[in-house]
Amino acid sequence: MVNPRFSVNVDRVRAVSRALAGIGWDGFVRLDMLEPEFNVLSEVYHRVGDVRVLLVLGLSAAIVDYQLAGDAFRFWNTLQKVLAKRGFKLSSIGDIRAVMGEFLNYPVNARFNSTKRGRVAKFFNSGFADFLWDRAYKYYSDRPTEIWYGLAKTLGNRPDQKTIVFAMKVLDLISLLVNGSYANFPRDVPIPLDVHVARMALYSGIVKGDGSEISERVIQRNKEIFLRAWGDVAERVSEMLGRRISPLRIDSLVWQLSKEAQKASYRRNHAIRYIIRYLVDVANIDGNVAKNVAQELTYKMPY
């Protein structure tokens, strides 16, 4: 049941959307290219040059990118080390499955390891990897919804489950890497909702509620509210820019800036400085825009 203490704050959605629109299309693309998974996928593509490898490897890794003993950077950097150790030999589905088997032995994947192995086994044993390798690589960018719902069905998950949606973000980044444009996802594709993204919804004020209460249980009970709030932000930013800004783009921004806020122990004055510095120095965003984004995303954060 939805907790009545959590609700979408339309006024804050408007304010946050205005700030984020200042980032512009190119800014959102640069933020996507700073994602840890993009760096690894880019190296694989430049070494192997096969979109089939990117799809099978990227999606099979994405479905186990949760409950990490570390963070996403450690997860994807570890995968990169496994690939380098094998000389980036990735000429078949069997090669990729062997990589995933070795990757799951590493400490970053220690939590829920048997469950993760089961998910990877389903991915390969069900024929889904073969589907990507034999057919879907030809049209993954034009018809991503077929892959999205097919993956959810294969793993017995809802299409809006975090790891399923995150896998689609990986597909979207593969399309950007290979084609120079994003995949043709429908407007209702949700943001991959995790604790970081939910917490920033509360700290920005787009969701009314107490940030100290945030937990996986609270998120799941109020999932529709968090998804709607960020979805509304994406819609408004799209209207302001005159170009489609998917919630998957918003995710890159919010996730990266949540890590900066975390470094500042979620104290507003420090978080604002960290966020501005990151946006300006790392993402090459205008200083005034960065200041507006930092102030709006930390609006409800304690001092």
Describe each PLM feature range:
Residues 1-303:
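HhH-family (HhH-GPD) DNA N-glycosylase catalytic core used in base-excision repair
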